[in-house]
Amino acid sequence: MTAAVDTSNTLHFQCETGNYHTFCPISCVAWLYPKIEDSFFLVIGTKTCGYFLQNAMGVMIFAEPRYAMAELEEGDISAKLNDYEELKRLCLQIQRDRNPSVIVWIGTCTTEIIKMDLEGLAQKLEAEIGIPIVVARANGLDYAFTQGEDTVLASMAQRCPEQVQEEERETRGGLQALFYGLRSGKKKEEEGFHPHPPLVIFGSVPDPVVTQLTLELKKYGIRVSGWLPAKRYGELPAIEPGTHVVGVNPFLSRTATTLVRRKKAKLIPAPFPIGPDGTRAWIEAIARELGIPTPGLAEREAEVWRHPQVQEYLGLLRGKSVFFMGDNLLEVSLARFLVRCGMTVQEIGIPYLDKRYQAAELALLERTCEEMGVPKPTLVEKPDNYHQLQRIKALQPDLVITGMAHANPLEARGITTKWSVEFTFAPIHGFGNTQALLELVTRPLRRNAALKGLGWEQLVREEASV
């Protein structure tokens, strides 16, 4: 085993057989239930799943969140109870108390092991109670916790209509229609857009990011027909054969496959809009596929890089090295962004890598390394944590981006760390969130500098006198 950084002209791929130290994918409920405002998520699992949700999402005593646990007991596992009747009772209670537009069943490891036919039960129950029931098997058998969102969106993609009636199209717009009336002035609305096939963007991001990316595309005359997921289940985008689709997150390969194979959509191969360079490449890929020019886009990116606050953050990163242990499948995009910021990426550990879906991102990473004159990193799929720790000890990186399980042990050994899970929940997409992304990356470096100024950079062991 060598600790040297790969300096070859191409990206070097390795595959180890390490364990997956990551959150359970059912944690996707944390950011999906606020995103889909009229939904209710029912996690079907054991007490362990319930404890995890309580710890990961907080115990909401005074609020009634739109998710719940259907706890499997011994009678369920031994097939002594009628699963259909139990789930029917719970769904009727949810319908009575919360009246959602859609109920999402989240399968877990236990439902997989006991071979619970959730799809068959959902189809029968949906017809009986009259509420759409979407089944997503977001269990711990996946590689990374972010793939829970991928499973949910892949299931929802199959519910997208092929066409929307003109009357329904006019009323779409959610709550705005209640306050401002139906849409009017269709000709005026069409002004400023180039004629092109429908474009649907998939991936769950905060509403301000949805607005930012939609407006960025609008500047070049590109109309976004819809987002998956939509804010309301009834506003799922229409996806007909030939609709162009593009993702905003690198962990949505299953959703992309479903859209292409089941809905006959056309996937736009694009990097992901993380950082100014990624956002520019994302817009360029969409515009190139649709045959639309993007004047001034390069200057738009340069303007973001020239911002004084961004320059201050870049000064902290230039010349430093970073090591990714692998956690949430955002590693390749973040590595590409940090190379553009002037850092050297020593290794990219990643739980799972879909080379087809991330082909454009990998190509951009390779091109960025060449332009910045830094060695191309080694990508290690399913990394073995023991070997990773040996490589970290040999390479001594300035920053390690890792899961929470390894952060404190590494800090105790004098290695500066950053929790990778923070990048999952923070708004990091688009031009407008560049400062927020850099603030996240530089926080441990700024913290260490502040502690060093106070003379607290070393841990001192003292004998306790009891």
Swiss-Prot record:
The answer to whether UniProt assigns keyword Iron to this entry is yes
Q: Which residues span the membrane?
A: none
Cofactor: how bound: Binds 1 [4Fe-4S] cluster per heterodimer. The cluster is bound at the heterodimer interface by residues from both subunits.
Pathway(s) where this gene product acts: Porphyrin-containing compound metabolism; chlorophyll biosynthesis (light-independent)
Q: What keywords appear on the UniProt entry?
A: 4Fe-4S, ATP-binding, Chlorophyll biosynthesis, Iron, Iron-sulfur, Metal-binding, Nucleotide-binding, Oxidoreductase, Photosynthesis
Top-level taxon: Bacteria
The EC number on file is 1.3.7.7
Task: Give the GO molecular function terms.
Answer: 4 iron, 4 sulfur cluster binding; ATP binding; metal ion binding; oxidoreductase activity, acting on iron-sulfur proteins as donors; oxidoreductase activity, acting on the CH-CH group of donors, iron-sulfur protein as acceptor
Q: Mind telling me which InterPro entries this protein's record contains?
A: LIPOR_BchN/ChlN (IPR050293), Nase/OxRdtase_comp1 (IPR000510), Protochl_reductN (IPR005970)
Cofactor(s) needed, names only, are: [4Fe-4S] cluster
Q: What does it catalyze?
A: chlorophyllide a + oxidized 2[4Fe-4S]-[ferredoxin] + 2 ADP + 2 phosphate = protochlorophyllide a + reduced 2[4Fe-4S]-[ferredoxin] + 2 ATP + 2 H2O
Top EC class of this enzyme: oxidoreductase
**Which GO terms fall under biological process for this protein?**
light-independent chlorophyll biosynthetic process; photosynthesis, dark reaction
Which residues take part in binding [4Fe-4S] cluster?
24, 49, 109
Q: Which CDD domains does the annotation name?
A: Pchlide_reductase_N
How is the quaternary structure described? Protochlorophyllide reductase is composed of three subunits; ChlL, ChlN and ChlB. Forms a heterotetramer of two ChlB and two ChlN subunits.
What family, per the record?
Belongs to the BchN/ChlN family.
**Job description of the protein:** Component of the dark-operative protochlorophyllide reductase (DPOR) that uses Mg-ATP and reduced ferredoxin to reduce ring D of protochlorophyllide (Pchlide) to form chlorophyllide a (Chlide). This reaction is light-independent. The NB-protein (ChlN-ChlB) is the catalytic component of the complex.
The name this protein carries in UniProt is Light-independent protochlorophyllide reductase subunit N
Q: What is the lineage of its organism?
A: Bacteria, Bacillati, Cyanobacteriota, Cyanophyceae, Synechococcales
* Encoding gene per record: chlN
